[in-house]
């Protein structure tokens, strides 16, 4: 196994551990902290903070700390959110949500930069297309990462399953899109579990999050340590402002502007499943203790399809996969418009998340890979833009979650999906007419001379902004 592959696995399993905790907690927020919409508002604050941090933090942190330590520091911000849920209140939830959000964009930008550099270098070493290796690395990452939903949701369902309640039949009429009640209303079987069970779950999540930090800090190679050290010692205020503005400078590229709807839609579709489907369908008709089991189906489907699509892309191309994802989401949204959820239709509760997992696997793996391919010379700024616009989709969706009807939310998501496919296909057409040059070995090398103690030729440097 090459060092690049080993590092990809370390990053992947580190994220698996971290998001076993955060992913499970996010799926429960709309049901666990339903009072006055506090749960979804906290999620909105998270992604608003991610937007703010995307404007300047990722390039600055990555250039100064390197990818590894940016990931480690940012992981600590995620663990803080689990602590905030131990005593849920407006002050504790909103403050820890903001902390998590500030670490969110650097975390994902550093991860994407790490995988993209590794894929390009591995491709150069074995005389393969860099974009094929990037697709494979993102496929491996999301295959491992998306399985976090299995373990996080399994933990929540097993723990909360000790305190089950039967849904009154008269409450079932309020599930789905058939009625349009004030979303602040606690409907169906959304009673909060006992404090003892909640604290037990949060204790497990905190422990897993801390384990993720230790795992990455110990086993992940610091591939750009020397470049980060040189950057800190030789660059001054001018470079700070250049780095600060790098995210915004990239917006002058029309390709990035055309990818904004696609990136925002990723936020819309993820927030719908975690915020609307779990609350208005699963919790309402089956009870909060079943949210985890249903979301396990999504996570398993997402994980397997992420790995498969990452490898399949080199044979089918991106366009076919994006069209497949759009068709799946279109059919799912239309189905949710007309489906009346009932406990007797148990299998259907699992069908929608399974289909959603297939589509989301495409949105995640292929959009990340597309950014890495189109903006190879500005990866840090490109992935910062990715997180910023995806987070804006989350913010908008979570912000209106408690104010408009569920059917209206579905129509909005469908409109964004239509715009997404139009702009994305134009980007692909432009890429076909004017292909982006492949990254070369010389471009990947740092400007400074190679150090004598660089024994491993797989260790690669971070590209320059």
From Swiss-Prot:
The chain crosses the membrane at residues 8-28, 40-60, 71-91, 96-118, 140-160, 200-220, 256-276, 281-301, 319-339, 343-363, 410-427. The keyword Ribonucleoprotein does not apply. Gene3D superfamilies: MFS general substrate transporter like domains. Signal peptide: none annotated. It is a multi-pass membrane protein. GO terms for cellular component: membrane. Keywords: Glycoprotein, Membrane, Transmembrane, Transmembrane helix. The keyword Transmembrane helix applies. InterPro entries: Ion_channel_UNC-93 (IPR010291), MFS_trans_sf (IPR036259), UNC-93_regulatory (IPR051951). Its main location: membrane. Belongs to the unc-93 family. This is Protein unc-93 homolog A. It comes from Danio rerio. The lineage of its organism: Eukaryota, Metazoa, Chordata, Craniata, Vertebrata.
